[in-house]
Amino acid sequence: MPHSGLLKSPVPFLPGTSPSADGPDSFSCMFEAIMESHRAKGTSYSSLASLEALASPGPTQSPFFTFEMPPQPPAPRPDPPAPAPLAPLEPDSGTSSVADGPWTQRREVEESDAGATLAPRKELPSPSHSEDSLGLGAAPLGSEPPLSQLVSDSDSELDSTERLALGSTDTLSNGQKADLEAAQRLAKRLYRLDGFRKADVARHLGKNNDFSKLVAGEYLKFFVFTGMTLDQALRVFLKELALMGETQERERVLAHFSQRYFQCNPEALSSEDGAHTLTCALMLLNTDLHGHNIGKRMTCGDFIGNLEGLNDGGDFPRELLKALYSSIKNEKLQWAIDEEELRRSLSELADPNPKVIKRVSGGSGSSSSPFLDLTPEPGAAVYKHGALVRKVHADPDCRKTPRGKRGWKSFHGILKGMILYLQKEEYQPGKALSEAELKNAISIHHALATRASDYSKRPHVFYLRTADWRVFLFQAPSLEQMQSWITRINVVAAMFSAPPFPAAVSSQKKFSRPLLPSAATRLSQEEQVRTHEAKLKAMASELREHRAAHLGKKARGKEAEEQRQKETYLEFEKSRYGTYAALLRVKMKAASEELDAIEAALAQAGSTEEGCPPPHSSPSLQPNPTSQPRAQRPGSEARAGAGSTRPKP
């Protein structure tokens, strides 16, 4: 019977009609059509109770359904055609489409089950049920759902793994539903860089979930390392991806590489863990030998000693470790650089007005540390300029300069701000510096200039040691010019060198010098003096403790070398901070910013008493072997004596 406010649907239900024994009535046919519409959208219901759960009527509504009558009678229904057979699924070809998704498979199966009893959709009078009553929207029954709707519906029901299988670039937040086929597809795209950059590869392989592990395993299958040594395989692998990210992520990528290498070469190493240990050791060795670290480089003996007992409790073959060390030392490991990052770097280098002149090439005059980039200041004061002859005595970390780069070269020096520029031509204010002149420039922050009393081949020579422990020899035209250069370099370094960074906290026993900031200090002159004096006391105290701790002990080999390096460092820092503090005290006493006044005050008080380094305080780690006395031929003593005679003040 009719009720007000009931669910309505334009299904023809003529008065006096009743269900026929020969077939279903109009209500049944139309209800099946509605159900088929929902099945086409991927939704199935087993009974009418399912609809009641979706659209529960209000307390005033009747639990019965009523249907409105259309103005025209229904069209006659022909016999339903036989359902079309399901098309066989094609094998995976590496590409994805909507037809491959589970939505199509489920829809075809349901149509095959219900197709025998449903009328063709194009013969129905295009009924549509009310969205207000059922809470569901249905597409017209006379047409297939549009492709955009199919993609949207399927994406909403698929999990992340299935979306990856369809070609999405999304990754899983966890590996609970990792799918091998999806991992294979993603690995293939990563290897071919299909929609990915080289920087993206390591990020996908380095995640700690099951799906990323599957992807990494499939990705490494594209590499065949059979017959290669470990360093050769590592070079091939690192050229295909930019090894970026956090330490744990990079370690996972190297673990996948080690697993693949051991699979290809099971006889080369004893275990997969051994391959991983040796791979990480090669990466650390590469950083130690070719990185910007400060301190002594790792030797072959150190490399072998560090790996003792790490090959599943045993030792790696000694000849293998020697060969690997030699390979990394002769040719450093290089991995791919992301093209976008490279273009960004090149665009920065091409900036016509760079704020920082970065040293991008090596050489005797260039810095090897990124902390020592030169920052020229256009308005910086010029403290001194004049003729100088330069010789490179030691490269960074006091490494011996190659023989072909030790020659004396004439320059015109300009001490401008905290930078000593070396030009081929005389100083001209306002003239732009060439690339070669910038390359030869030397930053004097935390530097110390001292008289080269142990160098007898040329007169009027002084040492200059920089913050990264490069050592230069400079010859001035006269004794007065030499003393002036020493004083002005040290005064400028004392005024502008910022306090050093706090020492790093580490369990490493190996001695390494701390990094020194290249930026100018922000302290006042009085605060700068107190800082230098505090560092002087600290260095003196640490030097006494170091000597007392090793008094009477005879160290050998590596331990003795480290003790000597630390003692030399502490002695030099004590001399440097003592010089800085004394010169600033003289400057404050002179009450003048002119360096001529400071030089005059030092000349009156005596340079040694006022803090200038005494002649014996040479900054070289070891005596220069070329300065040792040698056997001379008869008649050469006079010439040698003339060259070693220093003019008296």
UniProtKB/Swiss-Prot annotation:
Residues 618-630 have a biased composition (Polar residues). PROSITE patterns: PH_DOMAIN (PS50003), SEC7 (PS50190). Brain. Expressed in the hippocampal and dentate neuronal layers, cerebellar cortex, molecular layer of the hippocampus and dentate gyrus. The keyword Membrane applies. InterPro entries: PH-like_dom_sf, PH_9, PH_dom-spectrin-type, PH_domain, Sec7_C_sf, Sec7_dom, Sec7_dom_sf. Residues 523-549, 581-608 form a coiled coil. Keywords: Cell membrane, Cell projection, Coiled coil, Guanine-nucleotide releasing factor, Membrane, Phosphoprotein. CDD domains: PH_EFA6, Sec7. Residues 70-88 have a biased composition (Pro residues). One of its GO terms (molecular function) is phospholipid binding. One of its GO terms (biological process) is guanine transport. Residues 120-132 have a biased composition (Basic and acidic residues). Residues 137-331 form the SEC7 domain. Residues 1-22, 57-161, 601-649 are annotated as: Disordered. The keyword Coiled coil applies. SMART domains: PH (SM00233), Sec7 (SM00222). The modification Phosphoserine is found at S345. Belongs to the PSD family. Guanine nucleotide exchange factor for ARF6. Induces cytoskeletal remodeling. Interacts with ACTN1. Interacts (ARF6-bound form) with KCNK1; does not interact with KCNK1 in the absence of ARF6. This is PH and SEC7 domain-containing protein 1. It comes from Rattus norvegicus (Rat).
